[in-house]
Amino acid sequence: MAANNKKYFLESFSPLGYVKNNFQGNLRSVNWNLVDDEKDLEVWNRIVQNFWLPEKIPVSNDIPSWKKLSKDWQDLITKTFTGLTLLDTIQATIGDICQIDHALTDHEQVIYANFAFMVGVHARSYGTIFSTLCTSEQINAAHEWVVNTESLQKRAKALIPYYTGNDPLKSKVAAALMPGFLLYGGFYLPFYLSSRKQLPNTSDIIRLILRDKVIHNYYSGYKYQRKLEKLPLAKQKEMKAFVFELMYRLIELEKDYLKELYEGFGIVDDAIKFSVYNAGKFLQNLGYDSPFTAAETRIKPEIFAQLSARADENHDFFSGNGSSYVMGVSEETNDDDWNF
């Protein structure tokens, strides 16, 4: 960084830095023409390009498919999505917000503010699915189930102390764990159904959510590694031990939850393997090797195919609100443009 730029940052504060400095000093605005870390600009451009809203997805086209499902399957889907809503509520209101306080750059602060908003959109998306497909009784019962299901509550609460704790690195690990691992057990169900041509538009929403989660996990993993590399080797080893210990603890909580959730539907073992596979991917994103065997992470081909953001989409992406689109750019024309 040039000397003048260093002086600029040393003599001014971001709004959050101003608060931390006991409301002393001069405030600065975020300057996208002076980027400390090019990864910030790259990720910002990607998340803006990927912006979407659930109202643009024709979930109502899934009503015929929904009506063909038994009540047990309908209740399972509703419970699963309500569980995902809880996790996204935590991430939007605590997890990503806490990362603003630990940001390395001004731009990282606003990126996590954007993440928090989009995770709020994800939580709203499940509400869109509910209001389209479910009865009020099903929705209310599912939300009551979330409050009263201990296995779900345990896994949902597990990361909150690290979000709000005093260790920025542990908070960053937790911020990556939610989009990088903890949601995937719930994602398994819509991908399983989509591979069987059921609820295809609902699955499109899940793919859009997944596309965002991949970026959120990647960015948190990248920032974790940038923080970690500045630490002494002993601290790096300590953090690695922490990550693996927390990961294994969460896997056990996830297994307990998935066994309770999916019992009787014939998908428990495959859902667990799907989760463990993504646990390995999460560890790799933090710069560690996956310790899991091929047998522990074997995913059926039809499920693996659903991980593609372009898999079997069902609506018009010209408007730029699908998972395989490129945002259209409009330009006004004049008479001369049509003189061929």
Swiss-Prot record:
Q: What is its EC number?
A: 1.17.4.1
Tell me the cofactor note. Answer: Binds 2 iron ions per subunit.
- Please provide one cellular component term from the Gene Ontology annotations of this protein: ribonucleoside-diphosphate reductase complex
Record-linked CDD domains: RNRR2 (cd01049)
Signal sequence: where?
none
Cite the entry's keywords alphabetically. Deoxyribonucleotide synthesis, Iron, Metal-binding, Oxidoreductase
Binding positions (Fe cation 2): 216
Instruction: Describe the subunit structure.
Output: Tetramer of two alpha and two beta subunits.
User: What is known about what this protein does?
Assistant: Provides the precursors necessary for DNA synthesis. Catalyzes the biosynthesis of deoxyribonucleotides from the corresponding ribonucleotides.
Query: Per its record, how is this protein called by name?
Result: Ribonucleoside-diphosphate reductase subunit beta
Lineage start: Bacteria, Bacillati, Mycoplasmatota, Mycoplasmoidales, Mycoplasmoidaceae
